Amino acid sequence: MLRLSERNMKILFVAALVVGSVFFLLLPGPSAADEKKKGPKVTVKVYFDLRIGDEDIGRVVIGLFGKTVPKTVDNFVALATGEKGFGYKDSKFHRVIKDFMIQGGDFTRGDGTGGKSIYGERFPDENFKLKHYGPGWVSMANAGKDTNGSQFFITTVKTAWLDGKHVVFGKVLEGMDVVRKVESTKTDGRDKPLKDVTIADCGKIEVEKPFAIAKE
């Protein structure tokens, strides 16, 4: 009887292993829908050290999506480093609208009518794969279709009405509180800050391993 009992226990043990393996194999893996929910990958970062008037208010670090919009990202990085002999350093955020966005990047005229890209004065819309999902997304400002230069804006709320019209290429990873300080600065009737909001310094931060962020 003892031998039969041991044999039965072994059979039951093996059966349990088989059933467990089958159950594990039948568990659903990540669906195509789940994969689509994954956000874009950050391949490089750019930092802005901002100043309002004579006060340094902190650093904003922006993650850029070089695999999704490589041409747009290359332009932004080069303007942040100044490697082409011109760029964002000492330029201003010339337009600030609370509960909407802050806009900068016009380093030639400083009033929203200038700026240029590393490809020439303007370059085409790369794609509209990404949307303005919420606060902190960075997108190209333009004057209509295919008129990208150097001007950009950072959202402070979800701005779905801009989807398909402006190329999204980055998101604020650090320093959203600094963006909020700029958003809250006093402006005139044309949305220009009463005190200059300046990019006192800027540059590139390498990313060793690209990582995805949430679309939120």
Swiss-Prot record:
Pfam families attached to this UniProt entry: Pro_isomerase
N6-acetyllysine: residues bearing it: 165, 209
Annotated positions of the S-nitrosocysteine modification: 202
Presence of the UniProt keyword Nucleus in the record: no
PROSITE patterns, alphabetized: CSA_PPIASE_1 (PS00170), CSA_PPIASE_2 (PS50072)
E.C. numbers: 5.2.1.8
CDD domains: cyclophilin_ABH_like
Cell compartments where the protein resides: Endoplasmic reticulum lumen; Melanosome
Keywords from the named record: Acetylation, Endoplasmic reticulum, Isomerase, Rotamase, S-nitrosylation, Signal
Prevents secretion from ER, short sequence motif: residues: 213-216
Enzyme class name: isomerase
Signal peptide: 1-33
GO molecular function: cyclosporin A binding; peptidyl-prolyl cis-trans isomerase activity; RNA polymerase binding
Any GO CC annotation of this UniProt entry: cytoplasm
GO terms for biological process, alphabetical: bone development; chaperone-mediated protein folding; neutrophil chemotaxis; positive regulation by host of viral genome replication; positive regulation of multicellular organism growth; protein folding; protein stabilization
Keyword Signal in record: yes
Annotated positions of the N6-succinyllysine modification: 84, 209
Regulation: Inhibited by cyclosporin A (CsA).
Domain PPIase cyclophilin-type: 47-204
Quaternary structure annotation from Swiss-Prot or TrEMBL: Interacts with DYM. Interacts with CALR, CLGN and CANX. Part of a large chaperone multiprotein complex comprising DNAJB11, HSP90B1, HSPA5, HYOU, PDIA2, PDIA4, PDIA6, PPIB, SDF2L1, UGGT1 and very small amounts of ERP29, but not, or at very low levels, CALR nor CANX.
Family: Belongs to the cyclophilin-type PPIase family. PPIase B subfamily.
Known role: PPIase that catalyzes the cis-trans isomerization of proline imidic peptide bonds in oligopeptides and may therefore assist protein folding.
Name the record gives this protein: Peptidyl-prolyl cis-trans isomerase B
Organism field: Bos taurus (Bovine)
Originating gene: PPIB
